Amino acid sequence: MTAHFTDRPDPTRADARLAKASTWNVGTRRRQRAAVDAIRKAWAGREWPHPGLLSYSVYAGEDGATLLHYSQWTGEHAYQDFVREGRDLRNAEIDAAVPGIERLELHTYELYRSGLRAAGDTRQTGCLVIVEAEFDGPDPARQRAWVDTVFEALGEAAELPAGGIAAHFHVSTDGTRVINYAEWESAEHHIAALAAPGDGVGSPSPRWERVHDYPGMTGGGGVHRYTPALSMEPGVGG
């Protein structure tokens, strides 16, 4: 079973019990490109490492320095097996090609709620927007209640902003974080949606004020835009 390269993962796939997300700081756009090439080579040249790994995707940060890694797993045991048996060889090859990569925190998530693309919508995801929210302590009920509050605020709009495709809210298994994995046609569409007068995404309203001022939020996190760089899954027949 080898890697099959695809255009994007499916965050809503039913067999994905967990998602892992982390960031690498590689420093420059040139090193971003070199790291993506090294990742592709390291994975294409080996057997798929574990049947419990359902997809692995890499996104290039708009900042020209970072790479976001998003992977889907059948469960934590599958990930731990991969760490023991398959991660080091790949990372060693990547590090040899691009020395000095800074690997930042890895977080584990479960998909909680999605705003899905409409039936028949075949638009390509040209920009991934990650919106992070952090809370002052573990509270799974609070995570989910905050996401529900976001959906209530989004429900005020008659339709998605131009260029918006889908939003997938993930809650961390430690109870302290939420990310919105938001698919957009382009970065320009997302920028325009934020800047839209009066009714832009997150514009002042009682419901959006509840989102921004939710009890226990630390003010950490932020909004980050990425360009899809690489996505893969097990080959057919594996």
Give the positions of each predicted feature.
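Short S/T/G/P-rich N-terminal loop/turn motif that feeds into the first structured element of a domain
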Residues: M1-L67, T74-G238
